[in-house]
């Protein structure tokens, strides 16, 4: 790897880390934000819906915004969001989560599009960085709050300073990325005489021409999106639906007794509260994500639907454990959660590697940003379903004389 390639890899690793670490910390803090009585999917919903909305809308407007302007927007929204999350008021917390979510979704689209300019080395760095965000965010939150007993508010405020690392974007060697991207302007008009390229900046035209241009731009964008649905979006959505149902709806109920004679001798020493179990699951999940996103390019899986099927099997196993209490030791569940994260990370990196390999170069930048809608949509569906699934599992456990899901 040349010095230039190494530098690009490191920068995109850092961008992936910072863009995702706040998302991870917020999900790790879900049990501290809403407590044991409210479903953790409430935090997931606030953490994913704004991100999904910005991703759904971005193909229609993002080409007008310079990358430098996007970076400053990311820093502002992320810092403000984490500052608000540190408040104890639930409404203010959820508002802060929404700001951080918008930043995360907008950042993912932005940096995935930037990989179009810096090729696979940048995607490898980005994917590894997003995986690193998981393990660093999850593990640091676990160590700070569960082992070192740092107050949750102070921990969240410390994380609010991290987005300033996005300023390293301005250290990237110029590759015309300060301009708005031009892929929408590269449509071959010979293929469709009626297509009118959407302008990067508005010019003085009459209202009817502008309206016609906008309508044609929207129709063309929808046409380009439709082609990406089944090869990339459906399997990625399915994987994320299954894994986030596990993480935010089932995992909070995968508990074991930590007090008295019922406590297993094999229980980790730092399991003092039931929230410690949940936070540990999150860390193990993120460890699996980190490993697969870092080395997924070495273990290529081009059939994305296989990964979706395997993740569905994991969901079934965890629901059975929650309902029937099959194993009384946490270690088997902890290994399964790690494996679940590994599959999720593998699905993510292989999806975008497939795009780089299979899509036309003129369409790659658009496809990279557009397909990022899929993972957020899967998480959004999981959040909605989880609002009902976690309470149902918890009620069954209480009736089965396992009231741990309502205990701190």
UniProtKB/Swiss-Prot annotation:
Membrane disposition: Multi-pass membrane protein
Subcellular location: Vacuole membrane
Cellular component GO terms held in the UniProt record: fungal-type vacuole; vacuolar membrane; vacuole
Family label: Belongs to the battenin family.
Signal peptide range: 1-30
Ranges annotated as spanning the membrane: 42-62, 80-100, 128-148, 150-170, 238-258, 323-343, 369-389
Keyword Cell membrane: no
Any one Gene Ontology BP term: L-arginine transmembrane transport
Annotated gene: YHC3
SUPFAM superfamilies to which the protein is assigned, alphabetical: MFS general substrate transporter (SSF103473)
Pfam families per the UniProt record, alphabetical: CLN3
Annotated protein name in UniProt: Protein BTN1
Job description of the protein: Plays a role in vacuolar arginine transport. Involved in pH homeostasis. May be involved in ion homeostasis together with IST2. Not necessary for mitochondrial function or ATP synthase degradation.
Predominant location category: membrane
Species this protein is from: Saccharomyces cerevisiae (strain ATCC 204508 / S288c) (Baker's yeast)
Keyword Hydrolase in annotation: no
